[in-house]
């Protein structure tokens, strides 16, 4: 293990234990133990002009042992801190799912989690309070399955040492699988001109089969729906370190616009990591509501939940630009949505021969 990683792990352990020590000091001073966190809501995110990302605002909520509910949350925090510190001492790691089940073995029933969403949220809370990423706690999610295909040579750390991989020549049709912690990757060289993030596996496979990555020197990143943190981190590194334009290609519905938003602006629940995960320069290719009209794409009508989501996005500060106001307004007017693969109504090659080249040229990428 490198010195850098040892230093990161030491800092992670120290910051975790500092949380428990804070509770102890509050007890010793005769104070009720408490922990303050930023309010994680749409109304408490603000634009950081220096970093060009959306971050939490000044609104805070306090978790206090003054109530039974608050005391339980602090108890769970202490048990989780103890587990994570021990995990770091032993040089081991675990998944978020395993943490949920591991709590079943804790000797205090009140410290056990009711479901995984509760333990996941607590890990996020500990990230915020400690200022340390969960990857440095040695916590990882389940495999996202997201993959990369394109003219990129990299070096990754494995249990058997470092190995070099070319993300076209050394992989099958599936591509190179993004590791849980992409900061363990070193970029060696690339012939790529841009990055294309693709929402669906079906469209990603179409682009690869049609040779889009070869023909246009593109690094195709499969987002796999709502992108995992590792996928967003790798995308940001491709932009920041290799100076590659990043584009995002999704379905044409409000949920897919949020997928783009998580890549470009960051998500509300991980706004504390926006500078680490978000790529504010990322551009949205489509499917745009304007594309639905221009290409007369096969569509489905908007559901009530779609309409509510679109109206919510109009109030979301991350989508309050002229482009999004116009496109969302148009979608509400036409009352339609379309999938990426609806482009196949014009032939299997239309997306790679016509749609993407034309849109990328319009955006100044090609």
UniProtKB/Swiss-Prot annotation:
EC number: 5.6.2.2
CDD domains per UniProt: TOPRIM_TopoIIB_SPO
PROSITE patterns assigned to the protein according to its UniProt record, in alphabetical order: TOPO_IIB
UniProt: Mg(2+) binding residues: 199, 251
UniProt-listed InterPro entries: Spo11/TopoVI_A, Spo11/TopoVI_A_N, Spo11/TopoVI_A_sf, Topo_VI_alpha, TopoVI_A, TOPRIM_Topo6A/Spo11, WH-like_DNA-bd_sf
Domain of life: Archaea
Keywords assigned by UniProt, alphabetized: ATP-binding, DNA-binding, Isomerase, Magnesium, Metal-binding, Nucleotide-binding, Topoisomerase
One cellular component (GO) term of this entry: chromosome
Cofactor(s) the protein requires to work: Mg(2+)
Active site: 101
Catalytic activity from the UniProt record: ATP-dependent breakage, passage and rejoining of double-stranded DNA
Enzyme kind, highest EC tier: isomerase
GO MF, one annotated term: ATP binding
Topo IIA-type catalytic domain mapped to chain residues: 7-146
Quaternary state and interactors: Homodimer. Heterotetramer of two Top6A and two Top6B chains.
Function: Relaxes both positive and negative superturns and exhibits a strong decatenase activity.
Family to which the UniProt record says this protein belongs: Belongs to the TOP6A family.
Protein name as catalogued: Type 2 DNA topoisomerase 6 subunit A
Lineage: Archaea, Methanobacteriati, Methanobacteriota, Stenosarchaea group, Halobacteria
């Amino acid at each position: 293990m490198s010195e850098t990683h040892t230093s990161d792990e030491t800092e992670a352990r120290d910051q975790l234990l500092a949380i428990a020590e804070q509770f102890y000091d509050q007890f010793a001073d005769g104070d009720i133990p408490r922990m303050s966190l930023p309010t994680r809501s749409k109304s408490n995110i603000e634009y950081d002009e220096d970093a060009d990302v959306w971050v939490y605002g000044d609104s805070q909520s306090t978790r206090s042992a003054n109530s039974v509910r608050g005391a339980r949350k602090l108890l769970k925090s202490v048990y989780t801190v103890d587990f994570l510190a021990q995990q770091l001492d032993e040089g081991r790691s675990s998944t978020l799912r395993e943490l949920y089940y591991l709590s079943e073995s804790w000797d205090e029933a009140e410290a056990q989690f009711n479901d995984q969403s509760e333990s996941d949220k607590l890990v996020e809370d500990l990230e915020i309070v400690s200022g340390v990423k969960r990857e440095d706690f040695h916590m990882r999610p389940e495999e996202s399955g997201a993959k990369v295909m394109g003219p990129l040579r990299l070096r990754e750390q494995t249990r058997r040492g470092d190995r070099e991989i070319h993300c076209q020549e050394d992989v099958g049709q599936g591509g190179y699988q993004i590791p849980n912690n992409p900061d363990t990757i070193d970029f060696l060289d690339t012939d790529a001109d841009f990055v294309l993030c693709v929402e669906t596996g079906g469209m990603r496979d179409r682009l690869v089969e049609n040779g889009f990555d070869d023909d246009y020197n593109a690094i195709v990143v499969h987002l796999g729906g709502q992108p995992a943190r590792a996928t967003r981190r790798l995308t940001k590194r491709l932009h920041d370190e290799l100076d590659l334009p990043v584009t995002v290609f999704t379905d044409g519905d409000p949920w897919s616009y949020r997928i783009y938003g998580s890549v470009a602006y960051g998500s509300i629940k991980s706004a504390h990591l926006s500078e680490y995960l978000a790529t504010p320069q990322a551009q949205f290719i489509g499917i745009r509501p304007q594309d639905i009209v221009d290409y007369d794409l096969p569509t489905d009508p908007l559901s009530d939940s779609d309409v509510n989501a679109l109206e919510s996005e109009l109030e979301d500060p991350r989508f309050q630009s002229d482009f999004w106001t116009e496109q969302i307004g148009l979608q509400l007017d036409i009352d339609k949505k379309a999938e990426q693969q609806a482009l196949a109504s014009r032939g299997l090659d239309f997306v790679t021969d016509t749609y993407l080249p034309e849109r990328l040229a319009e955006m100044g990428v090609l």
